[in-house]
Amino acid sequence: MGAVFISGRESAVWLNKHLANDIGSLAIEQAHYSFLLNDGGGVIDDLIIYRLAEDVFFVVPNASGVDAVMAHLIGCIGEADVRLENRSGSVVSIAVQGSMAESLMQSIFPEIGFDRLKKNDLKLVDGKSDSMILARTGYTGSDGFEIFTDIEEGRALWERLLNNNSGVECHVCGLGSRDTLRIEAGYPLYGNELNTSLTPIQAGLGFFVGAELKQTLKEQFPNNLPKVVYFKVLEKAPPPRNGYEIFEGESSIGKVTSGCLSPLTGEGIGFALVNSKISLNESEKYSIFIRNRKYSLMFVKRGIIYS
């Protein structure tokens, strides 16, 4: 993940002009999910904003999006009293996720009352060289925490987590497991469900957009534009993958953007970008083309695994 620090007397007001939702509602030591948008309403990147102090923010973009985010923000500064610092090469991010995450974190940081940290809350603690950020955030759909610190301390923390004596088993997970977890939870991935050509409204994420901007986007873009929707495959089938076609009857209406077999249910699930108005919970209307045959498909509310 990226690590961009934004500070200065006008940082809050300035950020509010460039993000999709209201920074003013964010208390110190709180975080929220947002989008950096281009002039056309498309998503440059999705990111999490952490408010460390009144005029100090920590922005976490995707690792692949750091250059685009920095270029856009630098181009927007003008005369504003704002300072940007890209520390992506020196800040380590460790995501501790799962139902036992709180117990594990409590054993590593006994001085912190993690039971009092609500979702999206954060705590600044003294590290060896700088403040360490402990936040109740993550992108798996489960409870969990993220740790942001310097490389040396991150390496030591990694070993402490894996070799902890709390009785909690801690396993290393890669991006493949993160991908299935976020698909089960109905979370989008930049480059698949989000890009510079799609607005948050099209991506089905309008609830993360401030009311005024949402109205502007709705006025600027017609309802018949392609939309990101969530589906599950109704028959036993190979995993749905990016690029597989979706049909309504004999007509192709879109393609899969992300898909997998759910480890929880064994069903094929995922996201698709469709060009047509669709109906939820219709079991006989839609299909997906996988390995030279069609399988029945239903569009459902996203994140149905956890509903």
Question: What function would you assign to each model-found segment?
Answer:
Residues L52-S307:
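Conserved, structured C-terminal
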Residues I6:
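Short hydrophobic beta-strand that contains or immediately precedes a catalytic carboxylate
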